[in-house]
């Protein structure tokens, strides 16, 4: 109703529930949806594709897997870890999905914001092999 009166232009919703997301994608009430999607949580990939096909904007939350995983990952990197599971690659993973409109990674430090912007600005395409490696490694580690 507020849209009809010109008070608002768009309506969005945030959810962690796949069941709720399915109802949103099938309905006509929302213009955007904010969902969790990452190599740690790829279960929403198909629903993101369906939302995009219905012209529903998709905002990805927690593309790095959440603060606990991110802190642990950065600790591993500082200790010499050299696998594929890095914050940069996780951002690439989320941004590579054609149905994703934008991602909102959390950042506790200004340097992380700069790193995230640089990743998004200079993002190399993610190959299918890289995607598979990220999903496999995230499943093993977490």
Language model feature labels by segment:
Residues 1-12, 30, 57:
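Short beta-strand/loop segments at the ligand-binding rim of alpha/beta enzyme cores
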Residues 2, 39-46:
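Short N-terminal helix-initiation segments at or just after the protein's N-terminus
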Residues 6-14, 106, 129:
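Glycine-centered small-residue hotspots that permit tight backbone geometry or close packing
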Residues 9-17, 34-41:
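Catalytic beta/alpha-barrel core
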Residues 22, 26-32, 44-142:
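Structured C-terminal cap/extension of enzyme domains
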């Amino acid at each position: 109703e507020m849209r009809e009166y010109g008070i608002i232009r768009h309506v969005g919703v945030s959810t962690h529930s796949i069941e709720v997301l399915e109802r949103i994608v099938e309905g006509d009430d929302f213009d955007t949806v904010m969902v969790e999607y990452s190599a740690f949580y790829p279960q929403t990939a198909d629903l993101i594709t369906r939302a995009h096909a219905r012209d529903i904007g998709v905002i990805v939350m927690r593309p790095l897997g959440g603060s606990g995983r991110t802190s642990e990952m950065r600790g591993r990197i500082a200790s010499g870890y050299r696998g594929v599971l890095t914050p940069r690659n996780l951002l690439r993973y989320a941004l590579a999905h054609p149905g994703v409109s934008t991602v909102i990674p959390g950042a506790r430090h200004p340097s992380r914001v700069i790193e995230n912007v640089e990743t998004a600005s200079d993002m190399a395409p993610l190959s299918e092999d890289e995607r598979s490696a990220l999903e496999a490694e995230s499943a093993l580690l977490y």
